[in-house]
UniProtKB/Swiss-Prot annotation:
Gene expressing this chain: nuoC1
Membrane topology label: Peripheral membrane protein
Organism for this UniProt entry: Aquifex aeolicus (strain VF5)
InterPro entries associated with the record: NADH_Q_OxRdtase_suD, NADH_quin_OxRdtase_su_C/D-like, NADH_UbQ_OxRdtase_30kDa_su, NDH-1_subunit_CD, NDH1_su_D/H, NiFe-Hase_large
NADH dehydrogenase I subunit D as annotated region, ranges: 217-593
Protein name: NADH-quinone oxidoreductase subunit C/D 1
Enzyme class: translocase
Length: 593
């Protein structure tokens, strides 16, 4: 596990005697008072090389502070910073990464509702702080524009606080779902209550729009939230001088479903289906990242049978190609290359058929399980996969012939949307976006999971970080995915049909426990991540020993990759808006959660 050790942080401890280091099985934390938080974060970034910002949020300790037994249980495991402080309701955490040394660290502090902003250290932190303000009501001193991230600005509540009910607060009367406009009212089995949670009005949305917009020019162009070029319910406001974009504002939340709130009320295996519905274009990869996180929390990841690990790795790489094919087809279509769209979707349909034949589903799949996979590969599955990976490289080569040296393609992509290495760290981008900037950051190599430490593959990187580099990186990633799948198929062909595909545990009761009453994960915390087609999908999980997590913070790669978009659009033309957005490749189900 790539966690920093206390010995790696001695220089920090000498510079800040008030700080302390806590090493746990699945994390290393630096505990600091709030008044030196910014100084410690700056020291970690500038002196110790922790330049990549991964995530920031808070944990609401209200339920623990009100339950002495539960509180002492987590204090015993060193999960709480400054446990003697019973007044500060929230524990804030910041997750940073040192790419050069491949080490990760968490910085923790306590607060009762106010924190200093980190926006001058990392722009990505600015978006993370908006989310914390939106969900928990945390106020950030010095924040340039502290507005809500997902909810509309007149919404009066903070949904991720422990005292906010899962079903919301019913305060608005709306027609019952049993009532119809025409014909007889339905005599349904359920009599739905007319009182519902608050919904935004047009006036609420106008207030939200005005709070986002910092008008600097004469023309404002609305792009979205329902535009074919955004490929999802994303809303952009462009401030224009002629066709030149002076500044860009992003309004998210149209697809916000409260996934992290739901996680606190579902058992660990039950939450698996919600990971399908975040990045719905790469559900298998999201499933895999979640089950690996919980396996590591439970201490059973090394006990998962090799067959299950190779199956999960193979299926995730098929899903990666699937996702990149959809990206390539729609990207080319947006720029006028209709032929590539047709070719890419023809091959993607073959992968969809393979996935459906193995798992029974095409989009929302939930095939992996904590401890393995739901079922073994059906007979003939490997033969179909071998047939696909034998022909696919030839198809990919033909597309490269059409696109890679095409003069129009070059003009639309070369030196457009350049992301330097410094900007990549500053904005917390990951996946093909950071690799396009020449930084070889790939979780499959840096923190291998499942069978990734058993297979050989390369990490493609770009040179200058423009849209063209990001295109080349994704094309090469599909080739590397084929390499990985070939090795997985070769291993699986040698395995007996009777080899286990699920870790049974003591007394062979784990699977029954997980699918039935739910397994109890031990008291602890973990940050674990997987390499999704869009970047690092991370899960920060706090467990108090129950069948459901106390807190789940999801690090969505699309959310942080998208935060660099306004920077890339400055002084560009409207025609570049689609190109740059498509090169980032966000999925709105993941940004909004």
């Amino acid at each position: 596990m790539p966690w920093a050790k206390e010995g790696d942080l001695q220089e920090l401890l000498k510079a800040f005697p008030q700080a302390s280091v806590v090493e746990l099985q699945n994390s290393t934390s630096v505990i600091v008072p709030k008044d030196i938080l910014i100084d410690v974060l700056k020291y970690l970034k500038e002196k110790l090389g922790y330049k990549l910002f991964l995530d920031h949020s808070v944990v609401d300790l209200k339920d623990l502070l009100e339950n002495e037994k539960e509180f002492n249980k987590v204090v015993k495991q060193n999960l709480i910073a400054f446990p003697e402080d019973r007044e500060s309701r929230f524990q804030a955490f910041y997750i940073l990464y040192n790419v050069d040394e491949r080490k990760r660290v968490i910085v923790k502090t306590r607060t009762n509702g106010k924190l200093p902003t980190i926006e001058k250290l990392w722009f990505a932190g600015k978006w993370a702080e908006r989310e914390c303000y939106d969900m928990f009501g945390i106020e950030y001193e010095g924040h340039e524009n502290l507005v809500r991230a997902f909810m509309w600005d007149t919404y009066p509540y903070f949904p991720l606080r422990k005292d906010f009910p899962l079903e919301g607060i019913p305060e608005q009367e709306l027609p019952s779902l049993n009532e119809v406009v025409f014909g007889d009212n339905l005599e349904g089995l359920m009599n739905y209550d007319r009182m519902h949670t608050r919904v935004p009005t047009l006036e609420d949305l106008e207030v939200t729009e005005k709070k986002r917009l910092k008008k600097k020019a004469q023309i404002v162009l609305n792009w979205g939230p329902l535009h074919p070029g955004t490929h999802g319910t994303m809303w952009f406001l462009f401030d224009l001088e002629g066709e030149r974009i002076v500044q860009t504002d992003v309004i998210l939340g149209q697809l916000h479903r409260g996934v992290e709130k739901l996680a606190e009320h579902e058992m660990y295996n039950q939450f698996l289906v919600y990971t399908d519905r975040m990045d719905y274009l790469s559900a298998l990869c999201s499933n895999q990242a979640w089950v690996v996180a919980i396996e590591r929390l439970m201490g059973i990841h090394d006990k998962v049978p090799p067959k299950a690990k190779y199956i999960r790795t193979m299926m995730s790489e098929l899903q990666r190609i699937n996702s990149h094919l959809l990206w390539l087809g729609t990207y080319a279509l947006d720029l006028g290359a209709l032929t590539i769209f047709l070719y890419a979707f023809k091959e993607r349909e073959k992968i969809m058929d393979i996935i459906e034949g193995i798992t029974g589903a095409r989009l929302t799949i939930s095939y992996p399980r904590i401890g393995g996979v739901r079922m073994d590969l059906p007979e003939g599955a490997l033969e179909v996969i071998k047939a696909f990976i034998k022909k696919f490289p030839e198809e990919l080569k033909d597309w490269e012939t059409i696109l890679t040296r095409n003069r129009i393609w070059l003009r639309r992509n070369k030196e457009v949307g350049i992301i330097s290495k410094e900007d990549a760290y500053f904005h917390g981008v990951t996946g093909p976006v950071i690799r396009g900037s020449g930084i070889p950051y790939d979780i499959r190599k840096f923190e291998p999971y499942d069978a990734y430490d058993e297979v050989e593959f390369d990490i493609p990187v770009g040179e200058i970080g423009d849209c063209y580099d990001r295109y080349l990186v994704r094309i090469e990633e599909m080739k590397q995915s084929i390499r990985i799948i070939e090795q997985c198929v070769a291993k699986l062909e040698k395995m007996s049909k009777n080899e286990p595909f699920f870790y049974e545990g003591e007394g062979k009761k784990l699977k029954l426990s997980l699918d039935g009453i739910g397994v109890k994960a031990p008291v602890g915390e973990i940050y674990s991540s997987g390499e999704n087609p869009r970047g690092e999908l991370g899960f920060y999980v706090v467990s108090t020993g129950g069948t459901s997590p106390y807190r789940v913070k999801i690090r969505p790669p699309s959310y942080y990759n998208l935060c660099i978009y306004p920077h890339l659009m400055k002084d560009r033309y409207v025609a570049d808006a689609v190109t740059i957005l498509a090169s980032i490749d966000p999925v709105v189900g993941e940004t909004d959660r």
